[in-house]
From Swiss-Prot:
Its EC number is 3.6.1.-. The gene is rppH. One of its GO terms (biological process) is nucleoside phosphate metabolic process. It comes from Caulobacter vibrioides (strain NA1000 / CB15N) (Caulobacter crescentus). This is RNA pyrophosphohydrolase. A motif (Nudix box) lies at residues 43-64. Its cofactor is a divalent metal cation.
Length: 172
């Protein structure tokens, strides 16, 4: 598929960060109420930006992580439409019908001390944990669930495990 496919969907990249033991990094969305407030890093692609460059940039901005090795990526765009409540808020939809995403899988090769939820001025997450890839579709907002199911299917060969929540410094 090309950039012209799904022209009403904002180009976006998503990142699944795998611990060396196969667990995945999950971030709890800052200021979003449970139960659907855990997700992977993701974000928009700048005009003319290479997709993998965008994925590495988003990962660094949202988590502080730069010590990674590429494991794989999804083929083509995976799309989702915004639900009516998002479409009704121009701040969130910004004229787009939804998002089209390419997902990247990386192995984390750094130390956990590298993870910094305040690496960028725009905080996306207020806590993080290692979890199981197969649990992620149940943790995400329902309108993104199909995307996460596709990502699980694409990257399941890299996965297994679970771990406790780690919060930003000063958070309970």
């Amino acid at each position: 598929m090309t950039e012209l496919d799904h022209p009403q969907h904002r180009p976006n990249v998503g990142v699944v960060l795998f611990h060396p033991d196969g667990r995945v990094w999950l971030g709890r969305r800052h200021r979003q109420a449970p139960p659907y407030n855990w997700q992977f890093p993701q974000g928009g692609v700048d005009e003319g930006e290479d997709l993998e460059v965008a994925a590495r940039r988003e990962l660094a901005e949202e988590t502080g992580v730069t010590s990674v090795e590429l494991l794989g990526r999804t083929e083509g765009w995976i799309t989702y439409d915004f639900p009516p409540e998002v479409m009704a808020n121009p701040k969130h939809a910004r004229g787009w019908r939804g998002q089209k995403q390419v997902w990247f899988a990386y192995r984390f090769v750094g130390e956990e001390s590298e993870i910094d939820l305040e690496a960028d001025e725009h905080i996306e997450f207020d806590a993080w944990r290692w979890g199981r890839l197969d649990e992620t579709p149940e943790l995400i907002v329902p309108f993104k669930r199909g995307v996460y199911e596709a990502v699980v299917a694409a990257f399941q060969g890299f996965a297994r495990g679970d771990s406790p929540v780690r919060r930003r410094e000063g958070e309970n």
